[in-house]
From Swiss-Prot:
Name this polypeptide is given: Rop guanine nucleotide exchange factor 3
Summary of the function given for this chain in its UniProt record: Guanine-nucleotide exchange factor (GEF) that acts as an activator of Rop (Rho of plants) GTPases by promoting the exchange of GDP for GTP.
Sequence ranges of Polar residues compositional bias: 16-28
Native source species: Arabidopsis thaliana
Domain PRONE: 95-473
PROSITE patterns, A to Z: PRONE
Record-level Gene Ontology MF annotations: guanyl-nucleotide exchange factor activity
Amino acid sequence: MENLSNPDENDDHQSPRSIDQNDQSAVETPVYSTMSIDSFVYPRTCSETTSGFSDQIDETNSFCSEASPCNWPVLTESKSSKCLSGLEMQSNECLVVQEISEPELETMKERFAKLLLGEDMSGSGKGVCTAVTISNAITNLYATVFGQNLRLEPLETEKRALWKREMNCLLSVCDYIVEFIPRCQNLSNGATVEVMESRPRADIYINLPALRKLDSMLMEALDSFQNTEFWYAEEGSLSMKSARSSTGSFRKVIVQRKEEKWWLPVPLVPSEGLSDKARKQLKNKRESTNQIHKAAMAINSSILSEMEIPDSYMTTLPKCGKSSVGDSIYRYMSGSGRFFPEQLLDCLNISSEHEAVQLADRVEASMYTWRRKSCLSNSKNSWNMVKDLMSTTERTDKNYVMAERAETLLFCLKQRYPELSQTSLDICKIQYNKDVGKAVLESYSRVLEGLAFNIVAWIDDVLYVDKTMRGSE
């Protein structure tokens, strides 16, 4: 088993929104981990697979057929508990089949000891919180398994087993993040009582099965690239401008890729290009994978929006929103007429994604600055009364209006650049997040988003080379 603690793994992802395999320095120590280099700076449901670390017990049928004298249901052995022995036998059979080697076992012990100690192997109690530790572990596992996977081909059997086994272990934490909901229980004597039963927390109950399904679909997508009509040149055997086919002929190959990405493998196609069937299949796979990418990105954005804003971020906000966005943008936003964010973005002439991220940071900071000033200007103290700022009478407050316009501008900016990397606030939320469930969902959705984006980029490379070859005929 490869060690998860590998900050030098390469990703192939051209958008900083997702994990970038194109940058050799992508997997580095996140700013929110003060104890370990095995982490990553970035910028998204009930488990279908029963974890080997926890046995899920259904308590809905855990009552006897007869009521007690006090009419309280008497707990007896449930149906699911009767199945535990069978599940344990199946689990033991799986263990026998897998036969984890001694080095792998020692690596897992070390890794989970690291999780327990918060990445502080000295045991001095100075480690990061559990949420950050698990987030880093999932990110590092992704880098270990997919870091060197830079082409459209099935994942190696060993890496697939590593990914599935360790993700099941990391996701098993969610089995214990539950909430209680009321449920009516019908007794044998006809009486109905209301009992409380546990189920996974709402966000986990909804999102985790969806993420597992997306994970499975991405694995199937990679498995489908067998016996393809395209292939890859050996790394270092050709430049970005020429390639040599298996027949010994030379032809010009131009890939849609920055010149500094020289270490990435170059896709090759036959001299006449791909067949119509192969080209159609590639386009269909690209479309389906792109939908997976959008779904993972939506889940990630949703989880991030639910995370609490750290106090450390609020303390760094400027006292004036105007100083954050700049004079020209502020002048346009503070106009008395109707605000058109799309026109403002057109006037800014954003030429790169880096500029877009900087603008998003500034607009987001100004938005929270104006919101804070709007709340402070209100004399009401309780939160329920502060929410009355939504009333019509208070919509005339200048700070409130500016905060609304900043939010609209930020929304339009993210719509125009859907693969925009995470803002400073998002990174700060991940850094100071202490909710283990949200940390699992955020990191899991983020790595799936990165993998989906990479697959789409690799397919685009093949289609571009195919188009170039057909155009040169």
